[in-house]
Amino acid sequence: MQSSMWSFLQKKEGGEIEDIEKKISNAQELNKLKTSPKKKREAVVKEKVEKKEKKETKPKRKSSKKNKEEEEEEEQEEQDGEEEQEEEEEYQQQDEEIEEDINGEEEMELDENEKEKNKKKKQSLKTKENKESKSSSSSKKTIENKETKKPEKQSSKQSNNLKRLKRKKMDDDEEDEEDENKTDDNDLDDMLDDDSDNEKDSISSKDKEYKEKVLKDKEKKEKEKKEKELKEKESKEKEKKEKEKKEKEEKDKKEKELKEKELKEKELKDKKEKELKEKEKELKDKEKKEKELKEKEKKEKEEKEKEKKEKKEKELKEKEEKEKKEKELKEKELKEKELKEKELKEKELTSPKKETIDISDLFKRANAEAKSSVPTSTSKNSKTNKKQKVDHKPTATTKKPSPVLEAKQSTTTTTTTTTTSTATTISSKSISSPSKKEEKEVITSKKQVEATKVEVKKEKEKEKEKEKEDDEEEEEEEEDDDEKLEDIDEEEYEEEEEEDEEGISENEEEEEKKSTQIKSKFIKKVPISKKKGNAKTIQADLKVIGKYRPIEDAQWKKGEAVPYMVLAKTFEMMESTSSRLIIIEHLANLFRSIMLLSPKDLVMTIYLSINKIGPSYQSKELGIGEHVLIKSLAESTGRSVDVIKQELTEVGDLGIIAQNSRSTQTLMGKPTPLTIQSVFKTFQQIADLSGTGGQQKKKDLIKKLLVSCKDCETLYIIRSLQGKLRIGLAERSVLMALAKSVLVTPPIDGSGQQIFDIRKQMKQEEFEERYQNVVSKVTRAYSQLPNYDLFVPHLIAVNGIDNILSTCSLKVGIPVKPMLAQPTTGISQMLDRFSDMEFTCEFKYDGERAQIHRLPDGTTHIYTRNLEDYTQKYPDIVANVTKFVGPNVKSFILDCEAVAFDAATKKILSFQVLSTRARKSVQLSQIKVPVCVFAFDLLYLNGQSLIDEPLIKRREHLVENFIASDGVFAFAKYSNISDVNDIQSYLEEAVEGNCEGLMVKTLKEKSIYEPSRRSYNWLKIKKDYMQGMTDSLDLVPIGAWYGKGKRTGTYGAYLLACYDENNEEFQTLCKIGTGFSDEQLTTFTSQLKPHLINQPRNQFRFSDSIKPDVWFSPSCVWEVLAADLSISPVHTAASGILDPNKGIALRFPRFIRIRPDKSPEDATSSDQVVDMYQNQKINSQSSKINEKDEDY
């Protein structure tokens, strides 16, 4: 078919011989390729296709003479085209089979990357073929346009031929030699049959060279491919090896780590096992000891029981003997009676006239016996009952009424009956029961009987005289009783208006007698579970608590949130004891566990322990009202509000009621247990809520907490929301527990070893010394940085205790509690204390203590002595800061006094005038009471703390960097004097200038500033010193009595108490009723009514002899002045310190003013009361007190 096609083309162009020769050479080449593989024949096929394309592109000549021949040839060509199409289909099938075989072999050798390359090559070849087919079709179209007579069929045939040749070009893969030879032989046979035999002789040398080049190129490509493949394989193998190495290394590391962990775990297990064994041994030893103790106790009990039995047996024997003797005596008496009766009968028979005389005598005698037999306590009881109506007055000693009067009172009804009936009854009694004397006389002899008759006559005369005397005494005693009743009524009225020197009783001597009898048993209202132990029991408890293991004994695992139940149980243990040492030990153990297992929860635990949700100066408080809590409790438990209120009146503690209440509502699922984190965050949310809808949201949050509570959690959740935990824990105790926890279980140091209990490595004395040192460091550091969020991380860091004073220093914007002064009894005492020391005297201004903070960005804050933010109360001070601050000052902390000041007269006004200013949202345009700042100390300046510098240098910094401004800012007036007369005159000058007195301070030695401490390096001499007492007291009203007379409708007298910081309780100090104006009585009554409570709080300590009409929850502080202090069996302030059974009381107290700048916990402490009492003894200038003054 190929030869015919080539011949047709050559004839049409002129029958050129060269074309025929080429055709023959091509045929010969095909002949040779029968035995060659298919890849070698590709080059020949390519050359043929290129030559054919060149020929097709040449222009064709026209010949009109050969039209018929052309038509015949066209018909033949059509037939040939059909045959060629069939052959092409066969070739295509064969080619596809060959490609599949070759691809299968290549896939075994090549990787996936080479397959993708082959695919890309095939696609590129196909695209090239498509382009070539398009170019050939375009060339054919040009030829058809030139040839007018040639039909379109010829062009299609040519294109088909070209396609067939190009498809052969696509045979890229090798097939088996046998299959390829067969297909090639068939093709070559067809070509050689049509051509002449001469074609076999001529083969051009050019074709051979071309073939060799093609083969070489292919070989090169194959070599390159193989080399690439080898390189890629090697690279892959290298990567695999590297990966395997890395994996091995990682496995080795993991195995090592696992081994190390296993070793550590083994060590821990061994340690635990050792500890367990030790514990088991200890437990066994304890059990043995307990068994021995029990056996001893049993033996002792048995011995005691034996002794008791023996005693009982002895007693029984004695009783039996006594009974026998009594029986014998009774029998004797009966016999004697019988004999006597016989003798009497005989007498009656012998002497009938004397019968009337005997009966009357016996009547009178029986009447006298009846009078004497009446108990003598009836009138006494009636009088004592009357006396008990007096307000805890000791009963006056009275004479005992005569037995005759008592007998007459009991027998008046019987004497009104007829004498005959009584005479007969009495005579029968007298006959049946004669006196023992007469019986003896009858038994002895008849002479004695006659003697008895004489004695009876004498007794009759005596009884008559006694009856007359008794009648007179009866009348006198009745008059005395009436007078005494009148006196008691008068005393009741007078005692309510005027009490004695102790505030309650009238006579000190009688009180002391009564106190010696009663021994003044004070009642401290504490929970039932509260225990008080002696020193031995406390030490035993401390030893048991000291064996606490912070990890093993904890109820949660490392990294977990601390359950709130752990804190609640700790509170419960602390509430069950009154020992401060045990309380600190319990809290320190909890802190140790939290530091080791969940250190993030430590700060929140501290805040919950002191019943706060943040630093004091942030003024975030819970203080939820009782009404809201009752509603929340009712809704969460399904109980009614009225029932809860009724129980509250009986119990007095809403927390106990909540703990005992069980929810009757069904829940969809179990609530999640409370954690310290969840409780603390909920408390913060409650404190932040305000405005419309705030109360309802608060109730919802409280209900969620209560629903999740278990066991004792409810008790302390409710108390925390009320703001009163009542567990006897002061903030100082919390700091001591923190110090102990860090000392006993210190953080891991550079060595990487964790010490769980350092006490095992130290002696007890050494540990105590170090503990006291750590406590002093911790308390001082916290006084400089009173923010647990900042303080605790420094404390629990590595070497935190050693560096705590340097890391926790003053910071602007964080207020510190001010340094306070000790009161003195006079100038002489002050001079004795400051002998051989330089000191200075400052005016003590009557205002409000203020601490001004100026930040580098220009903002100003003002804080009170309680660390409350009063910036809104004093906007005038904030506005005037720029007037008194020097140009070089960027930041400072100023200690000063804000004093009410009259700018017109330039005089200081009293504190009462200052207290009329509003506390919140004060606007400059509305200020009616202007304020002047009197500065006396500088604590911080331009980024540096000055508290460790002496006062003389701090004062220099103050004067150099601040500017005095009239009516706005002034320096506290001072003088460095030492003469007694000069000090006295300077004190008088201060009093004349409306100041409270003088502040005397050390100037150089021991003159550092000590925050939150009452120091003896500062002493105060107040103007009250000249009037008698050294200093006033700040006390809290906790009870009141209703007024009478002019004071009806108000409270006439109040019960005041001081605050004991160690036990967190209020101790009574006096009953006060003087110093109040009528307006003050009405205002105080209205102000205190919202704070009424049904029962005294657990934190109140009072005597059972004090019973006010109403009780108050602590809400305000009053300044009180008194004549002096005395030991009292009635009041409980500092009880047990100066006297084991008595406290301290104020004599003649009087009200001075309200102290709005102080909270109840900032009231005068019991320790201060003791100091004032001791200083009072030293004071030689004690005032003389008028005995007629009221004791209020």
From Swiss-Prot:
Its UniProt entry gives the catalysed reaction(s) as:
ATP + (deoxyribonucleotide)n-3'-hydroxyl + 5'-phospho-(deoxyribonucleotide)m = (deoxyribonucleotide)n+m + AMP + diphosphate
Q: Where does Mg(2+) 2 bind?
A: 996
Q: What is the lineage of its organism?
A: Eukaryota, Amoebozoa, Evosea, Eumycetozoa, Dictyostelia
Q: Where in the cell is it found?
A: Nucleus
Q: What does it do? A: DNA ligase that seals nicks in double-stranded DNA during DNA replication, DNA recombination and DNA repair.
Q: Where is the composition biased (Polar residues)?
A: 1162-1184
Q: What is the name attached to this protein's record?
A: DNA ligase 1
Family to which this protein belongs: Belongs to the ATP-dependent DNA ligase family.
Skewed-composition ranges (Low complexity)? 371-382, 410-434
Where in the chain is the site Interaction with target DNA? Answer: 580, 866, 1046, 1071
**GO molecular-function term, one example from the UniProt record:** metal ion binding
